[in-house]
Structures are given as C-alpha cells and as structure tokens.
C-alpha cells in the first residue's frame, strides 16, 4: 500500500513539472501538417503540368507522323499561307472557339453530329489525267473523312487575276473523262459569267457537290477537272499553275462533312482550378501555347486547353469500372490501387504546315482531357 502511494506521488509530481497539456499546440501541429500536405499537392501538380506539356509535344509530332517539328520561319509562313476566304474564315473560327471556351465550362459533345471542314489541295496528276501529255489542273484525292461521312457542301475555289479595265469574264469548269471515239476528253460541270472591276483579283467559289458525290460513288471516274476563265480577248485569268508572286492562290476544294457521333452522354467527373485544395481525382486546367514552344509551323490554333488529371483515388470514387471495388475487397493485398487518369478525351482540329511546306487541315485525336476518373 505504501509503495502504491509513493508511485502516485511520483506521477503527480511529474505532471506538475511537465506543466499543463497545450491543446492549441496540437492544433498548430495538425495545421502545419495539413499545410505541408497542400504544398506537396501543389508541387505535385507543377511536376504533372510540366510532364503533361512535354508529353503533348511528343504526341502531336507522333500523331502527325513527324520525326521533328518542321523548320519553317515566320517570313516563309507569310509567303506560303493562302489568302483565300475560306481559310481565313477557318482561322477566325479557331479564335471564336478559343474565346467561347475561355471560361472552361464547355465540353466536347460526343452525342450530336458535328460539321467539319476539310480543305483539299490539288495533287500531281498521273498520265490518265493528262491531255496531250500535259498535266491539267486540277486533280484531287479525297481522305477517308470525306469518303465515309455525309457530304454537306463542296465548293471549288479559284482565283482570277486582276484586269486593267472593266471586263466580263466567262468561267467554265470542265470534268475530264476517258477519251471517247471522237476524241472528246471533257464534259461540262459549271459555267458562269462575272463582271470584274479593274485593280484587284478575286476569289470565286463554284458549287461542285454533285460532281464530288459522283466521284465518291465511282472513284474511277475522278480524272480531275479543267478550269478556264476567259475575258473578251481570250486571256485566261484563272490561276491554275501559280506564277512567281502568286503563292497561296492555287485552286482548292472546301468540303464540309457531318461527322457521325459514336458515343453517348456520360456523367461528368470533378473539375478543379489551379488553386483548388481538392485531394481527390480531379481535372485541372492546362493551356498549351504553341508560340511558347516556338512552333510557328502550327497556323491555328495558336493555343488550346489540354487539361490534365491529378489527385488521389480512394476505392469506389469515380471508378471507371464498378467491379474494381469488388476485386479490391476480395483481395486487398493482391490488387494495385486505382489511378487518376483521363476517362474521356476529345480531339482538336489543327491547321499546320507539314515538313514539305504543304498546308494540312486535320483532326488530332485524344488531345483534350474532358473527364478524369479512377481506374
């Protein structure tokens, strides 16, 4: 009994020496730990951002089948860039899309059909599309996007050289056909009469949707077209084979197709901003600036919102596959935890110069993170 009393006295004495327990100190320690966790999260997101930007550069070159970024100067771009209205409108559309999505609230819609514009430049013709051994303008090859989607519109754009005095110009578009018995090689497509004022040349568009539809149904009938634009004196004003100083004035096709949707609507994941303290798997904003890369060869867009995924994945939270949780419950040690990854991505349209100085308008798949989840 006496030993027990001595032990109690010693215990009380030590409590008095140690002083009262400071609950505020524990709170401060907890708060410091939380702040340290938030700082680590910010640092993690910074590293993720840098890695994502480098990955995007590699992906773009790979998906465009380019080993390195084309070395094209800004001066060369100014000389090569076509001055045609539809291309200028296309560039303007990139600006409109950028402004419309600047708040980050818009998401690519995979449910509804979308109309896309494809700019097709003429290619070199083969012997079959030549007349008397001379190549004729113009022969067009069509990508699978045009072949396998609904055709909405097809316009042939031609540039007419300026006239010195007011003139009436007769424009004729002819379709090349296989030689007939009488030697005929052409059949008419369109003809129109234009009144031109002196001073400047003009771009003129001609509807060729019916012709293009026939070509798509019977590819072997596509031997090319002949373009003529004669004034009263018989001078051909159409630029078919550009002369020096006529860069960017080559005829081309502007084709609009409706892209069929392939996926249905799904629920959205979490969206966060760069100042968010959310620790769970979330989509964060990330803007890719091609000018900052020094990639002048990309005409449009100059920048776009790519986004990235970051955060922790607890089981059952935003999991892509419901059975993932059941597998973990059955064997918690034998299954790796879920990771925060993109569960939905969308493409971007891009207007760019390839390594040969040609202008290409195409779609690069899976370049924008639309939704993040755990899988």
UniProtKB/Swiss-Prot annotation:
This protein's UniProt keywords: Cleavage on pair of basic residues, Cytokine, Disease variant, Disulfide bond, Glycoprotein, Growth factor, Heparin-binding, Secreted, Signal
Disulphides: 272-282, 281-340, 309-372, 313-374
Tissue: Specifically expressed in developing and adult skeletal muscle. Highest levels found in the hindlimb semimembranosus and biceps-femoris muscles; low levels in other hindlimb muscles.
Gene Ontology CC, one term: extracellular space
InterPro entries per UniProt: Cystine-knot_cytokine (IPR029034), TGF-b_C (IPR001839), TGF-b_propeptide (IPR001111), TGF-beta-rel (IPR015615), TGFb_CS (IPR017948)
Description of post-translational modifications: Synthesized as large precursor molecule that undergoes proteolytic cleavage to generate an N-terminal propeptide and a disulfide linked C-terminal dimer, which is the biologically active molecule. The circulating form consists of a latent complex of the C-terminal dimer and other proteins, including its propeptide, which maintain the C-terminal dimer in a latent, inactive state. Ligand activation requires additional cleavage of the prodomain by a tolloid-like metalloproteinase.
Maturation propeptide residues: 19-266
SMART domains cross-referenced by the UniProt entry: TGFB
Localization: Secreted
Keyword set includes Secreted: yes
Glycan attachment sites: 47, 71
Sequence similarity: Belongs to the TGF-beta family.
Recorded disease: Defects in MSTN are the cause of the double-muscle phenotype or muscular hypertrophy (mh), an autosomal recessive disease frequently found in the Belgian blue and Piedmontese cattle breeds. This disease is characterized by an increased number of muscle fibers (hyperplasia), resulting in an increase in muscle mass of 20-25%.
Physiological role: Acts specifically as a negative regulator of skeletal muscle growth.
Protein's name according to its UniProt entry: Growth/differentiation factor 8
Originating organism: Bos taurus (Bovine)
Gene, per the UniProt record: MSTN
